[in-house]
């Protein structure tokens, strides 16, 4: 009762000020529909194919990602208004390959402020799929909340026949607005499936069913705008939290790829170029070559550079490797953000090893 009254007053005031919000920033639109009985969901829009535009409805490859604004995306799915009140915030509008750690840090700080508002039930982030899992993992490690955070994308541009974005967006809002979604960390939603940000990865560059979590499985699915979760809320083993509320810049961490005859000195070059840590996308479970390991050992012992051994295979478990830090289940792109956050927190190589090994 009191919650409804307070939320009515709050959002009525907000609704009376659309012009004010527009004047303050053309990127921000306030709750565009309001019904006191519905939960409030904030959508942060980053761009990607879900906001992609092509001049032909049959074009699904050659299109401009990050072209359509959040208000247009929401307008295209009127059913959203049956599930929640929406506030849309356009943070960036680019292909996700253009996003930087600074963009992701900025998004995180916006979300931290948003989830602190008592009347916000959940968060949706619209995002390009190419680096979606990186942002989702970062949010999972930095936004310490039981409120649902759902990162959503699309594989077909908004102008395509059978565009998947509108249904994905509707489903993401449904999940963010549902009480069943509380306490499940950051989730990734595409193609009617709900995955944990900790485990889900993009597995195919073109197909609609690209996001998978083969080993850990999905958290749930959506049918007729009803989220069905397979298990009660749980936290992934080894999930850590990092406080970035006062962080202004993240340390540089580079990823090196493993292959037959790899150049051992690329690791040194990366450090000379400013890397404060390295992640290796090793062969198999994390193999690096003998000459490569020699260089890595030197960087660890002489320059105290933390080096995480991960795997170029999609799944697998990287155990102890030489003097490096095993990534355990984390793929290189997720391990990179974990290492950046660990270095940012001032942790020693031993501390970082302990953090990664929490997964095991
Ligand atoms: N490369 C673009 C991006 O990641 C388009 C891919 C997509 O969103 O599916 O934003």
UniProtKB/Swiss-Prot annotation:
Pfam families named among the record's database cross-references: Asparaginase, Asparaginase_C
Compartments it resides in: Secreted, Cell wall
Enzyme class, UniProt record, top EC level: hydrolase
Sites carrying sugar chains: 27, 35, 40, 82, 106, 144, 179, 246, 302, 351
Asparaginase/glutaminase domain residues: 39-359
Source species, domain of life: Eukaryota
This protein's UniProt keywords: Cell wall, Glycoprotein, Hydrolase, Secreted, Signal
Keyword field contains Repeat: no
Any single GO CC term annotated in Swiss-Prot or TrEMBL for this entry: extracellular region
Gene Ontology BP, a term: asparagine catabolic process
UniProt xrefs under SMART domains: Asparaginase
UniProt key word Transmembrane helix: no
Enzyme Commission number: 3.5.1.1
PROSITE patterns: ASN_GLN_ASE_3
Reaction catalyzed: L-asparagine + H2O = L-aspartate + NH4(+)
Family, per entry: Belongs to the asparaginase 1 family.
Name under which the protein is recorded: Probable L-asparaginase 1
């Amino acid at each position: 009762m009191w919650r409804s009254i307070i939320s009515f007053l709050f959002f009525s005031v907000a609704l009376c000020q659309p012009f004010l919000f527009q004047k303050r920033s053309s990127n921000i639109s306030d709750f565009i529909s309001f019904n006191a009985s519905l939960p409030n969901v904030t959508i942060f829009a980053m761009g990607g194919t879900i906001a992609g535009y092509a001049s032909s409805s049959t074009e699904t490859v050659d299109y401009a990602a990050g072209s359509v604004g959040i208000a247009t995306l929401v307008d295209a799915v009127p059913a959203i208004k049956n599930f929640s009140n929406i506030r849309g915030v356009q943070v960036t509008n680019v292909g996700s390959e253009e996003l930087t750690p600074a963009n992701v840090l900025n998004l995180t700080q916006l979300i931290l402020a948003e989830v602190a508002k008592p009347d916000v039930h959940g968060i949706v982030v619209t995002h390009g799929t190419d680096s979606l899992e990186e942002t989702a993992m970062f949010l999972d490690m930095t936004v310490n909340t039981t409120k649902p955070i759902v990162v959503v994308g699309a594989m077909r541009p908004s102008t395509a026949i059978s565009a998947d974005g509108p249904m994905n967006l509707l489903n993401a809002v449904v999940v963010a607005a549902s009480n069943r979604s509380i306490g499940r960390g950051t989730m990734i939603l595409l193609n009617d499936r709900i995955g944990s940000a900790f485990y889900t990865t993009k597995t195919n560059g073109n197909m609609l069913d690209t996001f998978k979590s083969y080993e850990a499985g999905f958290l749930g699915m959506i049918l007729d705008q009803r989220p069905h979760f397979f298990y009660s809320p749980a936290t992934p083993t080894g999930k850590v939290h990092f406080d970035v509320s006062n962080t202004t810049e993240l340390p540089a961490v580079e990823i090196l790829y493993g292959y037959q005859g790899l150049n051992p000195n690329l690791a040194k070059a990366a450090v000379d170029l400013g890397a404060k840590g390295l992640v290796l996308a090793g062969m198999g479970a994390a193999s690096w070559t003998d000459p490569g390991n020699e260089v890595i050992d030197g960087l660890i012992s002489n320059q105290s550079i933390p080096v995480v051994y991960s795997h170029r295979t999609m799944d697998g478990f990287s155990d102890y490797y030489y003097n490096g830090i095993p990534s355990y289940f984390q793929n290189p792109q997720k391990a990179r953000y974990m290492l950046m956050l660990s270095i940012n927190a001032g942790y020693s190589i031993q501390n970082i090893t302990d953090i990664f090994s929490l997964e095991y």
